[in-house]
Swiss-Prot record:
Binding site for [4Fe-4S] cluster 1: C19, C33, C36, C42
Organism this protein belongs to: Culex quinquefasciatus
Coiled-coil spans in chain: none
Lineage: Eukaryota, Metazoa, Ecdysozoa, Arthropoda, Hexapoda
Protein name according to UniProt: Cytosolic Fe-S cluster assembly factor NUBP1 homolog
Residues given in the record as [4Fe-4S] cluster 2 binding sites: C247, C250
Statement: the UniProt record of this protein carries the keyword Ribonucleoprotein: no
Domain of life where this protein originates: Eukaryota
Role noted for this protein: Component of the cytosolic iron-sulfur (Fe/S) protein assembly (CIA) machinery. Required for maturation of extramitochondrial Fe-S proteins. The NUBP1-NUBP2 heterotetramer forms a Fe-S scaffold complex, mediating the de novo assembly of an Fe-S cluster and its transfer to target apoproteins.
GO biological process, one term: iron-sulfur cluster assembly
Chain positions recorded as ATP binding sites: G72, K73, G74, G75, V76, G77, K78, S79
Amino acid sequence: MSSAEVTAAAKPADAPEHCPGTASESAGKASACAGCPNQQICATGPKGPDPSIALVKEKLREVRNKVLVLSGKGGVGKSTVTALLSRAMAQHNPDRNFGVLDIDICGPSQPRVLGVLGEQVHQSGSGWSPVYIEDNLSLMSIGFLLGSPDDAIIWRGPKKNGMIRQFLTEVDWGQLDYLVLDTPPGTSDEHLSAATFLKVTDGRWGAVLVTTPQEVALLDVRKEITFCKKMAIPVVGVVENMSVFVCPKCATESDIFPAKTGGAERMCADMEVRYLGKLPLDPRLAKCCDEGKDFLAEHAGSPTVTALKGIVARVQEFFETDRLTCTCVKRVLT
C-alpha cells in the first residue's frame, strides 16, 4: 500500500473530514472526533487500519473502472443517466462486462428503471450474485432485499455505510470492465463511504456529474464539484440532462428549463471540469424508465440516443486513454 492508501485505510468510512485515523494516538480524543459515531470505539479499541478497506480492494481487484454518478440536486436524472450509460456501454461492447451498483439506500430505483423489479438476489459460496439485465450487464440494489417496493428504509448513517460496505465486499461481480454506481443526491454518508473505499482500489475511478440547465440545479452541482475536489475524486465531467425538448413531429427545439447563466457548459468552464454533453428531454424516456424498457432499443433514432453516444465515447475516453501519454504529447505540441 502507498502512504496515501495507508492514510485512507486508517479512517472509517463514516469518519468526519478531519479524522486523525484509527491508528492515531488521538483517535477518539481529538476535537474532530466529537459527534462521530465511532468515537467510543476508536478511543477504547485497538489501533489499526479499517480491515474493510483491504477486503474491498481484494473483492474489486478484477473491476477495471469505477464510475460514480453524482449530483447535488435530486430530480435531475442521475438514475436515468446511470441506466442509459450502463446500457449503452454494454450494447456497444458485447465482449466486455458491466455492472451497476445502486447505493441510493433510501430510494433505490435501478430495479424498476432496468426492468428487473421483483427479482431476488441469490447467495453463493463466493457471495451475493447480482441480477443480470443482459448477458454482460448486472445489477445489485437494496431494492432486491426488500419484501415490498413500498417498504421504507429508515436508517442513520452508520447502517447505510454498513450496507455499502457489504455490497462492496460480498457481491460476486467477477471480472468487470466498468462498475457504475448510482448515488443519492447530496454529499453525505453514501458518498463519503463510496469515495473512501474506491480510492484505494486498483484500476481507475471517477465521477460523472448530472445537472439540468436551471440555476437552482447548477448551484448544488457546483458544491458537488467542490466535494469531489476536496475528496480527491477525479471528475470525468458533467452531463446536462433535459437540456432542450425536441419535438418528435417537426424536430423543433424548445428550452423547457432556460439557462439563465450559461447553463452547465458555462459552469464547467468556470470550474475547470469537462462538459460531456447534453441530453434532450424525451417523454418517451420517462415512459421506458417507468416500464423498465430499454429506451435505446425502443427509440434508436431519438435525438437523446444520438447525444448519448457522444457522452459514452467521452466517458470511455477518460478511463481508457493513457493520461500520461496525452499529457506528454500536449507538452511536446505546446
